[in-house]
């Protein structure tokens, strides 16, 4: 049974009914509509913490979806799951794929930076300062791009860039 038929929450049910109606009325092909249903069910499963089901739905959506913006959004959600599951290398790879599809996703860059910064802290704690600096530089590169795409949207990151001396962003709000 599709996840959309299992929603117990009134708001979820209402959203699902409205989304189904909109999808039926939109002048898009059946393949794109089916991709959207898989994406929506993946998002619902992800919100419920059922990551395996979410990934299955996202995989199906990717097989059907041709729109790069929608593919990028689907890949971003998959990367978030990998990141939550501790599969950080896979998350980085998937964030990069998402950015290849749609480069205007600052949250992908922000999350990549979080992983790089974490790896830098671990290397620093282990006394591997050269590795730490390399990871911190990669975090700064990803975060600088994120801040440029979303000025003022990541104040904590902007502060980190400034306080570590890694800031080369010329626009702060």
Curated annotation (Swiss-Prot):
Signal sequence interval, chain numbering: none
Alphabetical keyword list: Membrane, Photosynthesis, Repeat, Thylakoid, TPR repeat
SUPFAM superfamilies registered for this protein in UniProt: TPR-like
TPR repeat copies, ranges: 35-68, 72-105, 120-153
Mode of membrane association: Peripheral membrane protein
GO cellular component labels: plasma membrane-derived thylakoid membrane
UniProt subcellular location: Cellular thylakoid membrane
rRNA-binding found in the keyword field: no
Pfam family, one: TPR_12
One Gene Ontology term from the biological process aspect of the record: photosynthesis
SMART domains per UniProt: TPR
Keyword Chloroplast: no
Coiled coil: none
HAMAP family assigned: Ycf3
Reported function: Essential for the assembly of the photosystem I (PSI) complex. May act as a chaperone-like factor to guide the assembly of the PSI subunits.
Family of this protein: Belongs to the Ycf3 family.
Protein known as: Photosystem I assembly protein Ycf3
Organism: Parasynechococcus marenigrum (strain WH8102)
């Amino acid at each position: 049974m599709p996840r959309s038929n299992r929603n117990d929450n009134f708001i979820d049910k209402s959203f699902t009914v409205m989304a189904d109606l909109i999808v039926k009325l939109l002048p898009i092909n059946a393949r794109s509509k089916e991709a959207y249903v898989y994406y929506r069910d993946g998002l619902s499963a992800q919100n419920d913490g059922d990551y395996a089901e979410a990934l299955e739905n996202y995989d199906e959506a990717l097989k059907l979806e041709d729109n790069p913006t929608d593919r990028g959004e689907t890949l971003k959600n998959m990367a978030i799951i990998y990141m939550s599951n501790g599969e950080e290398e896979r998350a980085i790879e998937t964030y990069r794929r998402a950015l290849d599809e749609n480069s205007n996703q600052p949250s992908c860059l922000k999350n990549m930076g979080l992983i790089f910064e974490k790896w830098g802290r671990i290397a620093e704690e282990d006394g591997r300062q050269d590795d730490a600096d390399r990871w911190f530089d990669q975090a700064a590169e990803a975060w600088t791009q994120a801040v440029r795409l979303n000025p003022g949207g990541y104040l904590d990151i902007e502060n980190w860039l400034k306080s570590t001396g890694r800031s080369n962003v010329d626009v702060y709000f």
